[in-house]
Amino acid sequence: MAKQHITTHHSRGRGGRRSARVASLIMATTLLLAGCAGETPSNPEWPTPHFSPDMELPSGSRYVDGNVPAQPAFDTADPWGSIRPDAKPTAARIPSIIERGRLVVGVAQSLNRLGFRAPETSNLAGFEVDIAHEIARDIFGDPNRVEFRYVESRKRDDALHSGDVDIVARTMTITRQRQKSVEFSIPYLHIEDSILTRKGSGIKSVDDLQGKTVCASQDFTPGLLVSVMKPKRILHTQVWTDCLMAMQQDQVDAIYSDDAILSGLQAQDPNTVLVEVGQASGNYGIAMAPPGRAKDGGRDTAGLVRQVNSTLERIKKDGTLSKLYDKWMAEYLGPQRALPQKYRTPEESAKLGRQRAKYFHDVLKPRKAAEAAEASLKSGSGGAGEEDGAADPDDASRVGGASGVGDHRPDSASASTGSTNGGEIYE
């Protein structure tokens, strides 16, 4: 049976953050990073003394009973293609970014080997960070003309819609559901759902997790995990490194996510082993606001997608992507996997535009209005409205309005929780 595309439904639960571990939401402060493209992978090992399961859980973590109804986990529809690069020069594609003089990128800072602070230098490093540098290189001729902002996983879409960042390079799986909210590049990394467990645990597949305790980020709903496995209980943590700590303290038996994220944890503890689940697969892509949907009107969004895709095509052809993969990922994931390169037709763009219009109208706009009303009650100030935009199929997402969309079914779980995301299985 063919594997299905990875997707989950996110909750918007809030909790305290361990400041040394991860930034909350999007930090107001930003980092103009220079010279970190040469960082090399490091495998800082966690201490492995004997622990007791009675020890205090990582901050903000909680157990959830595994006896809950299963929730559909996978988005089975093939994603739409991206926007094909054109022959325009960079200055014509993204004039406002050229004028600003730097690319603003949303990244992680605690996902080892993907986006993290190198312990030796405190510089941001990782596979996704290096890809962002390559995008900046093609725009400015300088890979360091990039400003990194730390983005919490559940706020990635919001960061794009608000214009806080130009692009997000942070473990975002391309799914058709999510394409209603954001625009994606062509893929840069293939992922598979997996389990990380201790060597000698006896866990060889998801069947071995029945009656066990499984850890996952709080972005996973319990129903999703129950649909994949039959755990006795689930430990929800705020960051993935807390799952590793909990497993080292014998508080959980395994960690469930995709193999890219789990390989970063495995690199930190040689006493762990990665077990492929084989039920879902997907591809990471660079995310951008849909044309016409950013706070500033999204005037450069279609051009930015074309620019990013030009870079991804270039680094595939000249071997740069393979070199970056070998540097950061190959040690634990094995040889680089094949990546699709699919671009959509004008007719497909028009159909996607109508789906986006309905999604923004039916799901996102009410959610933002509710958030604005809540903020107004707390601060005593008024809320803000939503901006509109329009152009051709790839230069605005509102073509065709909200009518005539026969295949759009707003995700009920997403709508009820206020999530902007179609979902993924990672932080």
What are these regions (language model features)?
Residues 32-35:
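C-terminal motif of bacterial Sec signal peptides marking the signal peptidase cleavage site
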Residues 37-40:
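Bacterial signal peptide processing site
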Residues 47-168, 408-409:
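Extracytoplasmic small-molecule ligand-binding "clamshell" domains
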Residues 52-88, 220, 286-333, 426:
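Extended ligand-binding regions for polar small-molecule ligands
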Residues 133, 137, 144-208:
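Acidic, polar ligand-binding/catalytic clefts
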Residues 146-158, 235-249:
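Short helix-initiation/N-cap motifs at beta->coil->alpha
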Residues 171-180, 248-249, 253-282:
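A ligand-binding cleft/hinge motif common to bilobed small-molecule-binding domains
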Residues 189-197, 263, 267-309, 331-358:
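Periplasmic-binding protein-like
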